[in-house]
Amino acid sequence: MKNNLPIYILLCLLNLSWVHARNRQQEAETLIKKSVDALYNNPKQASYYAAKVIELFPEERQNDQKAEAMFYYSQAEKLLGNFDVSIKNLYDALEYATPTNKELNGQIYALIGALYCKLTDYNKAIEMSEK
């Protein structure tokens, strides 16, 4: 029994870490939904919810939830008139989005193109829209 004690402790710790990760994902999903719901009525609130999701995954790379939150954060900042902040976050979101998630990558590039169009940099807007 004593020989199995370290194994039991390890299994308990692994189980706890899995539960914590699952809770984080569920919290992120809830906050992203709140961000989407508030986007056009209250962009400042949408920005807040999206920023909370980004904080949930501080060091992770290749995380679609974080990239999606950054996308909605950028949309909210665009609506608030903060175009530079929006573009910077969209380029950062491209780093987090998995390359196989074509829909998310397409949405990010389309929003970058729309922002460059708003800033009257039409060549850059076309370049981003073609990706």
Residue ranges and their predicted role:
Residues 1-6:
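Positively charged n-region of N-terminal signal peptides that target proteins for export
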Residues 8-10, 127:
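Residues marking helix boundaries in flexible regions
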Residues 11-19:
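Hydrophobic h-region of N-terminal signal peptides that target proteins for export
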Residues 18-131:
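A "functional boundary" signal
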